[in-house]
Amino acid sequence: MNLTAQIARHFREVHFGGNWTSVNLQDSLAGITWQQATTKVDSLNTIAALVYHINYYVSAVLKVLEGGPLDAHDKYSFDLPLIQSDEDWEKLLNKTWTDARNFANLIEQLPESKLESDFSEKKYGSYYRNLHGIIEHSHYHLGQIVLIKKIILTGK
């Protein structure tokens, strides 16, 4: 297996399962209602806000992988559209899963030599650094989602 295939696999696994941590976004979010997803626990972000935030960066990098410019700004990364129904919540989840599948597929298509190239601009570092950054970022916020879910479900 070449390096881009391994990176794509690692990205898929944090979203859909099979990683060595045995924790993934899809399973962790299964059964979460829109009400639970939007429940505020102390000063923590909501589950929905974290899902949006993870996918905000996946979506931005996906556009670069598709040949477009990088257009992401940290100040907008938590600008979650209002979620007030099952339909709103499912729409966010479906976009997250679709973007994740497309993202992984495009990583697999990258030639390995591209991993050393500057990502969008030199200041952002290499493709390798950014792709792994997206995976690390997703794992980090997945951990938060799991903990917030436990707090909500146990009522503590």
Describe the residue ranges of each PLM region.
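Short, contiguous alpha-helical
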Residues: N2-T4, A8-S22, Q26-L29, W34-D79, ...
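Acidic/histidine-rich alpha-helical segments that form the ligand environment
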Residues: I83-S117, R129-I134
